[in-house]
Amino acid sequence: MTSFYTSLNGLKNSQTDLSTIAHNIANAETTGFKKSSVEFADLVANGSAANPRMTQGLGATVAGINQNFGLGAIEQTGRSLDVAIDGDGFFATRNPENNEVLFTRNGNFQIDATGALTNFAGKNLQMFETDATGALVNPGVTVDAIIPVTNAGGADLSSLVIQNDGLISATYSDGTTEPVGRVALASFAAPTGLRPVGSSNWEATGFSGNPTFEAPDTGRTGQLRSGALEKSNVDLAEEMVGLITAQRNFQANAKAIDTATQFSQTVINLRT
C-alpha cells in the first residue's frame, strides 16, 4: 500500500503545481504581479540504524512556493502619475484606517479630493519630505504623500508630476511649480520572504526582514521610470510548458494509483 500513498502524494503535488501555474497565467496582465513556482523535495524512509543501501523512497512533498521578483517589462503609458521601478525596490502604501503598511510594484497612482496621492485601493503613497530645493529634510522618516490643493498665493493645483528621481512636483494655476516630496522606496534583505496579500501587494515578515527606506536610485532600490508601469513578469510560453508537464505528472501518478489498485485486487482474489 506504500506505493498507493506515494502516488497519492504525487497527485496532490501535481495539483499544487497546476494551481500555481494557473495563478501565474491568470495574472499575466496584472500590473506589478510576480510569478511563483513550486519547489519539491523527496521523502525517504530511514532511521539511525537503517542500511543506506536499503533506504526506500516515499515520494515527494511540497518544500515551498517560491516567488520570482525578476523585473517585468516596463511599458510606457504617458500618464504623469504612473511610475515604474527599474530595480529591486517597492513602493510603500499606508492604510489611513489602521496604519497598515503594504509594499507593491504597481505604480499606478492618483490624487484624491483631499490632495492625498493614493493607489486604486485608497492607500496613501509614502514619501520623504523635502525643502524648497527638493533636498530631503528627514531621510529616515516617511510620511503620507499629501499634495496642497492650493499654494501660499491661493492658486489651485493644476497638475502633478512624479519625476524619474522620485521628486513629486506640483504646478499651480498661477504658473508656479513647487516640490512636494520625494517618493520613498523600500528594500528588503530577503524579498522572497515577503507575504503576498493580493492585488500585487506584500507585507513584511520575519523572513523578509524589516524594510529599509531610501530615495530612488539609492542602494538597491533602483531608478524610477516616470510615465510607465511595470507589467507582470509571467512568461506565458514558459507557463504553458510547465502546465503540460504538470498535467503529465498528474496523469502518471493517477496511472500508478490504478496499477497499485490492480495489485491489491489481485492479492484479494488470491485469498478468495
Predicted segment positions?
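Amphipathic alpha-helical polymerization modules
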Residues: 1-134, 150-272
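Solvent-exposed, low-complexity segments and loops of surface/extracellular structural proteins
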Residues: 131-144
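Residue-level detector of intrinsically disordered, flexible termini
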Residues: 143-147, 151
